[in-house]
Amino acid sequence: MANQRKIINDPVFGFISIPTGLLYNIVKHPILQRLNRIRQVGLSSVVYPGAQHTRFQHSLGAFHLMSEAIKHLTAKGNFIFDSEAEAIQAAILLHDVGHGPFSHVLEDTIVKGVSHEDISLMLMERINKEMNGQLNLAIQIFKDEYPKKFLHQLVSGQLDMDRLDYLRRDSFYTGVTEGNIGSARIIQMLDVKDDQLVVESKGIYSIENFLTARRLMYWQVYLHKTSVAYERMLISALLRAKELASKGVELFASPAFRFFLYNNIDKEEFYHNPECLENFIQLDDNDIWTSLKVWSTHTDKILSTLSSGMINRRLFKVEVSSEPASNEHIEELKDIISAHLGIHREDAHYFVSVPRIEKNMYDPADDSIDILYNDGSIKNIAEASDMLNISLLSKKVRKYYLCYQRLQ
């Protein structure tokens, strides 16, 4: 008799069991396998060298947590059909399939206005056609068009399996222990009330830890000033490459990457031209790094300086402040940099970037988690928690970054 499941050894959760059939067919599908070639945390390895883990590993981890959540919810008497269980497992495996290399950078440069969520859905529908409609229910739940709302919340919500995995995993691989949330404990505390996902009141401390960990990970890892500077360099390099391509300058690029460099692709085009999706699924981190390596010796001074800086970790200098940099200071920097590099003054903007980043420590729209008490009453975490100072956490933290080319 054929083996009924495949077992994958994961450093974070141990052995992950994947049943043969639809779910295993998704795991080995080329579109999911492509995520093996895309890092989960983009450029964060410039700060945390251990952060080499991939979006594929994250998808498997989220799948494992979903399997655990199904087990605990059904043990508490919440009825989930086998077909629904398989559908939410399929949906979580595919939830990140629309990410490109350095996803948010691409959304700002070469695939403008098309979010990875849009592309994930397009790819799910494409795989669904190949699989003769076996993903119909998964897509319905993913789009929140299925009557049982809590199933969608498990895939995409305040306490979804995506978040529970990436915090644990990113914490593990970066070594930033603050993100190491008690995902197993949270999953054991999950329940369903009035078709909404809730957490039993005895799990409240785990939720407080989860919310705090999430915010700490944002500032310590995802929005770390050095990672932000590195990302800004990549955005500048890609925008310069795009400008040169529009003037007909020959640039080294893989066929898929070339398609996006030499064509202007917006949301409308992406939806209606099948070539866009075909080329997109051929893109991974290797396309970008290979081009940067070759561009580092390009005759265009701007492109070669940015590319070699990326390759050799000569990063933009970065200053963080609670106030934006003055226009005079920015213009003065552009004067100095253009003179130092011997480039036209109007091209100096490639070497100075002033992103503003803001984040609520607690966002009611994003973090509203319901706590279920023994008497059946429900309170929002903001009311239920005696530890989280919600009014303080709800204040927006706004940081102004000034990233610019080093002069030596």
What are these model-derived regions, one by one?
Residues 94, 98-99:
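Short active-site segment of divalent metal-dependent hydrolases/proteases
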Residues 1-87, 101-107, 111-408:
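Histidine-centered, transition-metal-coordinating active-site segments
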Residues 88-93:
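Short alpha-helical catalytic segment bearing the HExxH-like zincin motif
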